């Protein structure tokens, strides 16, 4: 989803009142972008790619360090281990926005941001936002084979089908057979496990309700 951009250096976004011309979500994202510009976090790239990589972001004041994973230029596909990111349903946070601001400030990264990035490996990730979804991102290695495998588990937009949750382990096993470099990120796996448990509990409730109804008939 594309969000409206503020020229933050010229137009300060008010913290105590939402501007009328934007939605609540756009306001909250803009606030985090604005706050990020004033920070002096320390960044360490713990991966291999200059942009699409894992970063350790440390606040020198609190000495707290969070992991930021930059996987896409599109909001919702990145990750941060901070508490705010886990609950805000925005798909971003001040740490992600700070990393993006620092990366975009380097002229050497300009071409990377203007080019579609496709890694060699295929991965399963969790798309964050108002609605969280499991998404398959197919890399360049064994591209055709992964697309064929995906048809039984993912829709045309490569979001996990609802009826494929219980068979997710089968997909993971076959994906690793296609390419040992295949990745399923921990937050995506945790989400699938949680969704399975919700379905299991719902099924138990339905069965118990049906039994109770039959007893009184």
State the predicted function of each range.
Residues 1-217:
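Long, low-complexity, compositionally biased intrinsically disordered regions
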């Amino acid at each position: 989803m594309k969000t409206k951009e503020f020229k933050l250096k010229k137009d300060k976004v008010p913290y105590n009142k939402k501007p009328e011309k934007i939605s609540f979500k756009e306001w909250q994202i803009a606030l985090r972008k604005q706050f990020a510009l004033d920070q002096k976090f320390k960044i360490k790239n713990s991966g291999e790619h200059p942009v699409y990589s894992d970063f350790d972001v440390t606040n020198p004041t609190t000495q707290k360090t969070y992991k930021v994973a930059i996987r896409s230029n599109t909001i919702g596909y990145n990750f941060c281990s901070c508490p705010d990111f886990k609950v805000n349903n925005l798909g971003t946070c001040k740490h992600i926005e700070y990393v993006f601001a620092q990366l975009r400030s380097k002229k050497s990264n300009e071409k990377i941001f203007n080019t579609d990035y496709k890694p060699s490996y295929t991965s399963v990730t969790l798309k964050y936002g108002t609605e969280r979804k499991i998404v398959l991102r197919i890399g360049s290695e064994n591209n055709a084979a992964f697309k064929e495998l995906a048809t039984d588990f993912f829709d045309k937009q490569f979001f996990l089908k609802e009826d494929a949750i219980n068979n997710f382990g089968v997909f993971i096993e076959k994906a690793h057979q296609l390419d040992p470099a295949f990745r399923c990120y921990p937050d995506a796996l945790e989400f699938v496990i949680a969704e399975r448990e919700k379905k299991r509990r719902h099924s138990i409730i339905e069965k118990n309700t049906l039994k109770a109804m039959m007893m009184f008939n």
